[in-house]
Amino acid sequence: MLVLLQSQPSVPDCGYGDRMALDSNCLFCKIIEGEIPADIVFRNENVVAFRDITPQAPTHVLIVPTVHVENAAALAQMSPVITAALFSAAGEIAKTEGLDGYRSVFNTGASVGQSVFHAHLHLLGGRSFTWPPG
């Protein structure tokens, strides 16, 4: 099911992190453009979501903005509208996947596990999780 979310037509660079339409060297930008195959579960003008290739839960989907921005902090400063669109997409995907609950995670920086420097929200569900996360 595709859901169109309100978009922000022109988003200025806030000067925090790298931001451009797409980055030809970025793995996620290549997935957005269809240059690299992925199991895409959701797409609209602001967001593309696809299954993680090394899932950490029965449902593990990566939700990425369709503009290249390095991390969650930069995305939030650049566009609260697109940031909200990622969370709205997470809710729609969870509903489609039949999840009664889910965890959403942004890793911001290499020291906490960010390995692709294109902001992305992890949607994890289908099993129990502990707190604090390990």
For each feature predicted by the language model, list its residue ranges.
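HIT superfamily nucleotide-processing domains
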Residues: 4-6, 10-134
